[in-house]
């Protein structure tokens, strides 16, 4: 039995969907613990592409139970659309479960999200406009509507009427927008309730029972560490906690049941939206990374900003999450480069800085200090073991493991499941593996007398 968290070690879009899909074949349960439709993950199976926002990647395995947890925010229209798309591809959703305590994204959340972003002007955050922030704001303000409310028809009408009257005042007076019709919204969401009712459960209890039965549970993170509300590049962050600790809170479990944390990072770095990005490349190499990596958001379609691998934020992610091993994705995107840079530290106001500064103004002033490594100038997409990799590619991976101070368990060389190298058992491998002088993972137990 193993309970494993998969989280993003950068700014999201690291390829968690593929890694979770790979690991789901060994999982009995997959849990999505936070975020909403602002997160997208893509899985490619036998040439067929699945783009999901709310439903866990494990849905492609019919014997794997998939839970949308309490810490998520759910847009019912998007969820039902995803379910219909899966049905059209002959994928069952009978193994899907929805937490009764997850919060619901309402029409006024989307309207306020977009209007608020437009009103910010030069201070815009780069929100997806899907209503995620306002939904979480209502959750904190204790005025939100939860799945359990949606299922309670008697109270739903009164609650929606009161909330819409309150939100209409904001829409009209602050944003000069037309008010919403409470009856229309009530009818719409009652329809969603009937379609989703059979999927709704006490998710924390179900997860607890799976733990008691010693099942393998995979907790699937959305977004990435640097987008965490408390520990990311605030204010250019999401409205939830996509770190390992947030997975426990969002799933409704204690941290002591977690056996392993797997961090996912690209072989370079990307970011969507606004905010500082020390290793960003605006020239030809940045364009090459974007084009070869197909760096366009699953949710918004926006072009992602691309840059060199940043080991400073990588080490920060390892520390914040207690990462035991890494999955490095999109190594193949670097195949055509003569040289590859890795940021190992920053220069901040004339001083060497080897840690991530929490002050956004300081972070914006950080200049990357690079280590240059040779490229390999040949395709890696058909490599299926470390021995198949060009020496320079293997040296690059060893260097990343060294500067990140954690071992690499998985290397991804393309979107398909089979374009993967398993270096060590990512589920049952050693806790926080160390490296010997040859870059080979060894457990802490092996290093103790």
Swiss-Prot record:
The keyword Repeat does not apply. Its EC number is 6.3.4.4. GO terms for molecular function: adenylosuccinate synthase activity; GTP binding; magnesium ion binding. Pfam families: Adenylsucc_synt. Mg(2+) binds at residues 13, 40. One of its GO terms (cellular component) is cytoplasm. Gene3D superfamilies: Adenylosuccinate Synthetase, subunit A, domain 1 (3.40.440.10), Adenylosuccinate Synthetase, subunit A, domain 2 (1.10.300.10), Adenylosuccinate Synthetase, subunit A, domain 3 (3.90.170.10). IMP binds at residues 13-16, 38-41, 128, 142, 223, 238, 302. Pathway: Purine metabolism; AMP biosynthesis via de novo pathway; AMP from IMP: step 1/2. It is found in: Cytoplasm. Its main location: cytoplasm. It comes from the Bacteria. Disulfide bonds: none annotated. Belongs to the adenylosuccinate synthetase family. NCBIfam families: PRK01117.1 (NF002223), purA (TIGR00184). PANTHER family: ADENYLOSUCCINATE SYNTHETASE. This is Adenylosuccinate synthetase. It comes from Gloeothece citriformis (strain PCC 7424) (Cyanothece sp. (strain PCC 7424)).
């Amino acid at each position: 039995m193993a309970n494993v968290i998969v989280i993003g070690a950068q700014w999201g879009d690291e390829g968690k969907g593929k890694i979770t899909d790979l690991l789901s074949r060994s999982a009995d349960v997959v849990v999505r613990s936070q975020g909403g439709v602002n997160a997208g993950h893509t899985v490619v199976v036998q040439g067929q592409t699945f783009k999901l926002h709310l439903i866990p990647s494990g849905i492609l395995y019919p014997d794997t139970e998939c839970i949308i947890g309490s810490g998520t925010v759910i847009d019912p229209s998007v969820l039902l659309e995803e379910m219909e798309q899966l049905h059209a591809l002959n994928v069952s959703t009978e193994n899907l479960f929805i937490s009764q305590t997850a919060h619901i994204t309402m029409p006024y959340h989307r309207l306020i999200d977009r209007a608020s972003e437009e009103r910010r002007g030069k201070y815009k955050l780069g929100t997806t406009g899907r209503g995620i922030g306002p939904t979480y704001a209502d959750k904190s303000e204790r005025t939100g509507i939860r799945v359990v409310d949606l299922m309670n028809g008697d109270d739903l009408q009164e609650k929606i009427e009161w909330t819409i009257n309150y939100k209409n005042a904001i829409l009209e007076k602050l944003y000069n927008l037309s008010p919403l019709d409470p009856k229309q919204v009530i009818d719409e969401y009652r329809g969603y309730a009937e379609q989703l009712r059979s999927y709704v459960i006490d998710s924390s209890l179900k997860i607890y029972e799976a733990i008691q039965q010693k099942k393998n549970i995979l907790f699937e993170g959305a977004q990435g560490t640097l987008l965490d509300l408390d520990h990311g590049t605030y204010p250019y962050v999401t409205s939830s906690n996509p770190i390992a600790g947030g997975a426990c809170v969002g799933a409704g479990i204690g941290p002591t049941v977690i056996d392993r944390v797997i961090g996912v990072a690209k072989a370079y770095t990307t970011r969507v939206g606004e905010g500082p990005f020390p290793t960003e490349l605006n020239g030809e190499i940045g364009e090459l990374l974007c084009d070869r990596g197909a760096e366009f958001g699953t949710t918004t379609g926006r072009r992602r900003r691309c840059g060199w691998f940043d080991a400073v934020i990588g080490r920060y992610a390892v520390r914040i999450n207690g990462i035991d091993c890494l999955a490095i994705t999109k190594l193949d995107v670097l195949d055509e480069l003569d040289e590859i840079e890795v940021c190992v530290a920053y220069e901040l106001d004339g001083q060497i800085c080897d840690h991530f500064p929490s002050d956004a103004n300081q972070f914006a002033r950080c200049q990357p200090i690079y280590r240059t490594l040779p490229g390999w100038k040949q395709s890696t997409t058909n490599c299926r073991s470390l021995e198949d990799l060009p020496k320079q590619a293997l040296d690059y991976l060893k260097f990343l493991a060294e500067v990140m101070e954690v071992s690499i368990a998985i290397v991804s060389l393309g979107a398909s499941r089979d374009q993967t190298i398993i270096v060590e058992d990512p589920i049952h491998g050693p806790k926080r593996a160390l490296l010997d002088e040859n870059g080979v993972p060894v457990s802490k137990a092996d290093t103790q007398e």
